[in-house]
Amino acid sequence: MEDPFEEADQPTTEPGMVLDSVEAGDTTPPTKRKSKFSGFGKIFKPWKWRKKKSSDKFKETSEVLERKISMRKPREELVKRGVLLEDPEQGGEDPGKPSDAMLKNGHTTPIGNARSSSPVQVEEEPVRLASLRKAIPEEDLKKRLGSTGSQPNSEAESVPENVPKPPLLPPKRPLSSSHEASEGQAKDATSSGGTARFIISTSITTAPAATTAATSLAKTVNLSVTPSPAPRTLPAAPASTNTTATPSLTHMVPAKQPPIPPPKPAHRNSNPVIAELSQAINSGTLLSKPSPPLPPKRGIPSTSVPTLESAAAITTKTPSDEREKSTCSMGSELLPMISPRSPSPPLPTHIPPEPPRTPPFPAKTFQVVPEIEFPPSLDLHQEIPQQEDQKKEVPKRILDQNFGEPHIPSRLPPLPLHIRIQQALTSPLPMTPILEGSHRAHSLLFENSDSFSEDSSTLGRTRSLPITIEMLKVPDDEEEEEQTCPSTFSEEMTPTSVIPKLPQCLREEEEKESDSDSEGPIQYRDEEDEDESYQSALANKVKRKDTLAMKLNHRPSEPELNLNSWPCKSKEEWNEIRHQIGNTLIRRLSQRPTPEELEQRNILQPKNEADRQAEKREIKRRLTRKLSQRPTVAELLARKILRFNEYVEVTDAQDYDRRADKPWTKLTPADKAAIRKELNEFKSSEMEVHEESKHFTRYHRP
């Protein structure tokens, strides 16, 4: 890529210019000289330019890091610094404040009064949500909205009505501006529309049966619980299927109740999810109420038909379920959506145990997403025993609590999750009853909302524990769903608490882990991607643990092991086996031919010592005869069989001493003449000479 600065230099070095400059003379330096250093421009200028430009990515990353760091700080410290608002329960402030604080936290802006800062938040929130939306492919939105076609026409119609009103921001806006929703009807309209569309898209994706059933539950709850907002969206709700009812319900609730968390689905830790849920609860437990608990969802396919038939029963069920939800997942408007959508077990606010939840759609779907993805194989199985007893007992309890004080919890929602968890860590009192055997899972999962508001400690543990329980037992989903529906409706049934078989040590470990993990909601949303990745990692961790527990539960008993494994043998049995093996080996060896047979077939020759000696004597005789018949050296020389070099005697060097005093070193002239004569004879008679060179020799005359 050419650098712009270099291009700026280049025009000077056109060919014509170069010639002119050369002709111009010595005074004007030739322009070509400039180009000599253009290489440096290539190297340095773009570098400087890039360096000066501030990187958006860098800024975003730094913001994300700041948020993450802030997440690690305890809530009290953040409240002191003014980053977070105190919770309504603690400071008696507006329920909207926690969500505002969260929003501000996300933006890292100081927080004023929730109401006073609400306009600003409304402005900021759309921006943040817009960025969120961008991350979420618009095609997904369209698909989700398009999927409404599967629902009845009334619902589809209601959805389009909602959809055109808000572009992309409004949906986010209602969620974020739901804090201020009560203040402006116009805002409400847009927010409800946006949320409706938003939630509809999310909820639609789930199985229509489950959605409709859960939505009808939510709708009935809405009618009973939230009268004032109901008229707003309820017209659409009755007309539309339950799914639309759920969105409308969620919108109505935001419209009615000021604080609703920004829609960012970020479940970064348990914190964001918890933050979302706790905020939703803060904004109004109404929201959590309308959402039937996930356990009912599991039975929802069958539940959907009766949902509308008796509002009272459903409302009782829904409140109970909602109570469960609030206890387990602190359902906010998100939860209503969630409940219809996923047949998965109660959404634990506590993410560490939320193993298989990876949002199916873009993070937009909020909590719904995590829930939806619980692998039914793990969760549903274990949960259903619990859920049955929980549903049986919970309706009663929730009837007492919910109907005794239906609107009080909505106004004064239970303490936020992080506070409850801290209390749980500090005060072990609530846990002692819960820890006892059969009722442990049940009470942990669905402790009264009263106990929640009073002892947040139960919530922390409840939150963490439900999931451990969820994932351990896995009966078939369909069977369990059928069972759960009737149990949900029969409120007076005595609770048969079925506890998944999780070893006590494992349970305690998971409780500890979940407590430590769910430190408390920091009330803002993180970037979706980070949240998803973190969540998935956490989910996988929990899933691994739970699968381990499952495997431990499914280990075969000793008799089964004995059946399948190599049985232990007594000494007698081992001896028998050895004897059998020995017999087979002996039989095979016995089949080998004996030496006699081999001799008969001339394969093996019989040998005696006398025979061997005779053979040796014969060999000697033969050899001696041959040696005696050997010709002498003279004969061989005469017959020219031996050559000169073959019969000359050779003396070893060590034997041959050259010292002068030795006689053999002194050759007499006679010895020398004899040697010469022998050599000449050899040359003349035996040594071959080439024909052409014979005339050079003394003995070979040409």
From Swiss-Prot:
GO terms for molecular function: actin binding; protein phosphatase 1 binding; protein phosphatase activator activity. Residues 106-120, 147-156, 301-318, 484-497 have a biased composition (Polar residues). The modification Phosphothreonine is found at residues 358, 432. Keywords: Actin-binding, Cell projection, Cytoplasm, Developmental protein, Neurogenesis, Phosphoprotein, Repeat. Residues 163-173, 342-362 have a biased composition (Pro residues). It is found in: Cytoplasm; Cell projection, Lamellipodium. It comes from the Eukaryota. One of its GO terms (cellular component) is cytoplasm. Residues 233-250 have a biased composition (Low complexity). Residues 1-37, 72-194, 222-363, 469-536, 592-615 are annotated as: Disordered. SMART domains: RPEL. PROSITE patterns: RPEL. Residues 72-84 have a biased composition (Basic and acidic residues). Residues 508-518 have a biased composition (Acidic residues). The modification Phosphoserine is found at residues 116, 118, 131, 147, 270, 291, 342, 344, 427, 443, 453, 464, 514, 516, 557, 590, 628. GO terms for biological process: actin cytoskeleton organization; closure of optic fissure; enteric nervous system development; negative regulation of integrin-mediated signaling pathway; neural crest cell migration; neural tube closure; positive regulation of catalytic activity; regulation of cell cycle. RPEL repeats lie at residues 63-88, 583-608, 621-646. PANTHER family: PHOSPHATASE AND ACTIN REGULATOR 4 (PTHR12751:SF4), PHOSPHATASE AND ACTIN REGULATOR PHACTR (PTHR12751). Belongs to the phosphatase and actin regulator family. Regulator of protein phosphatase 1 (PP1) required for neural tube and optic fissure closure, and enteric neural crest cell (ENCCs) migration during development. Acts as an activator of PP1 by interacting with PPP1CA and preventing phosphorylation of PPP1CA at 'Thr-320'. During neural tube closure, localizes to the ventral neural tube and activates PP1, leading to down-regulate cell proliferation within cranial neural tissue and the neural retina. Binds PPP1CA and actin. This is Phosphatase and actin regulator 4. It comes from Homo sapiens (Human).
